[in-house]
C-alpha cells in the first residue's frame, strides 16, 4: 500500500532509519500538502465539454524547490513524495538528464516554429508532475531556454518539484 510522504517519514522515524530533523519536518509538511492537492485533482475527471474545449489541464499546483546542503535529505524527501503519488503521469529524473533530453528534442525539431512549445507538449503528454533531482543551471543559454520552457510547462498545468544545493 502506498504511504503518503508524511506517513513514510513517520515510519522511517519510528524505525530509526532516520533521525528527527526540524527542517525535514517542515519540508515533509509542504510535500504532504502538495501531495494531497495533487491527489484530489487526480480524482476529478474532466467532462466531455472540458475535453472538447481542451480544458482538461487547469493551472498547475504550485510546486516546491527544496534546497540545502549535501546530505540534508532533499532527495529522500522528494522520492517519498514521488513514490506516494498514485497516478502514473509523473516523472522523476536527474536535472542534467532532463536538459540532455530537451537539447536532443530541440535539435530534432530545428526549423520548426516555436520548438519549445512542441517540447512542452511532449512533456505534458507524459506527465503532470515533474520531479528534478539536483536542479542547477550555470549556462546562460540554458537559463534562457529554461525560462521559456518552464513557462510553457506551467501553462500546460505541469507541477514541478526540484532539489538543489543552491538557494533560489
Predicted regions and their residues:
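Phosphate-binding P-loop
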Residues: 37, 43-44, 53-61
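Walker A (P-loop) phosphate-binding loop of P-loop NTPases
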Residues: 71
Amino acid at each position: 500500500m502506498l504511504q503518503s510522504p508524511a506517513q513514510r517519514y513517520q515510519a522511517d522515524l519510528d524505525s530509526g532509519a532516520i533521525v528527527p530533523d526540524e527542517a525535514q519536518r517542515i519540508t515533509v509538511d509542504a510535500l504532504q500538502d502538495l501531495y494531497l492537492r495533487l491527489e484530489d485533482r487526480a480524482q476529478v475527471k474532466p467532462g466531455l465539454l472540458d475535453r472538447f474545449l481542451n480544458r482538461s489541464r487547469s493551472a498547475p499546483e504550485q510546486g516546491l524547490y527544496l534546497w540545502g546542503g549535501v546530505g540534508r535529505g532533499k532527495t529522500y524527501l522528494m522520492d517519498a513524495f514521488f513514490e506516494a503519488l498514485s497516478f502514473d503521469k509523473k516523472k522523476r529524473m536527474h536535472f542534467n538528464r532532463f536538459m540532455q533530453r530537451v537539447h536532443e528534442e530541440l535539435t530534432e525539431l530545428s526549423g520548426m516554429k516555436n520548438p519549445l512549445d512542441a517540447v512542452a507538449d511532449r512533456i505534458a503528454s507524459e506527465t503532470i508532475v515533474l520531479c528534478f533531482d539536483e536542479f542547477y543551471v550555470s549556462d546562460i543559454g540554458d537559463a534562457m531556454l529554461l525560462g521559456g520552457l518552464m513557462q510553457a510547462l506551467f501553462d500546460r498545468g505541469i507541477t514541478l518539484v526540484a532539489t538543489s544545493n543552491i538557494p533560489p
